[in-house]
Amino acid sequence: LTGNVYSPEGKPLADGYTIINKGGVKIGVIGMVTPNITRWDAKNLTGWTVTNPVDESRKIIDQIKGKVDVIVGVMHMDIDNEYGVYGSGVTDLANACPEFDVIVAAHGHKSIPNKMINGVLVVENKNAGATLSEIHVYLERGLNGKWKVKNRTSENLNMKDYAPDPTLTALLASYDERAKADAVTPIGQLVGGDLAPANEIDCLPQAMIQDTALLDFINEVQMYYTDAQV
């Protein structure tokens, strides 16, 4: 999903697209990431160039549209733009590139089972694998022998209703254990009492209604690592 990210040498971090052949149907899959990663990961992107997903997708579509039957966008971008940056949301992408049959959005961490934007079917899922989109693309073969998309439907499935896939679980086991071990690694020790006082009202954290040492600590850490002058 980094077809619009280029190294300091001008080489793409990954191919912007791939073509999958399923049962004689050629599916072009285009992957991009929001250009706003330059805001959040600036230190890790020194010298790298992140281009606009709309421009990159347009170039790829013009290159492959005569070679594929279905065009799918897989984008780490929300529905709407962020920070007023054109092309950072898939709405701009669908409006500029109506050749997309389906766009799978992300980043917004919300469930959008089926939204039509400029004739493009757009879906998005919740974070942490809570939902999964099931998309059906219906095609019809024309007299010239070529496939043509006739309809698209989709729904978001709640993964809590399904048993984990044992094969995928086994493949991810080592990463899962590493993440769990990292999550419980001690990074410090608190002595002398709690950083937040006891709740005065049940179910209402005291930190939400008064200044606390906990919030002061969080803010100090944020300022330290961002060099903020507040």
Identify the role of each PLM range.
Residues L1-D161, T167, I209, L214-V221:
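Acidic, metal/ion-coordinating pockets
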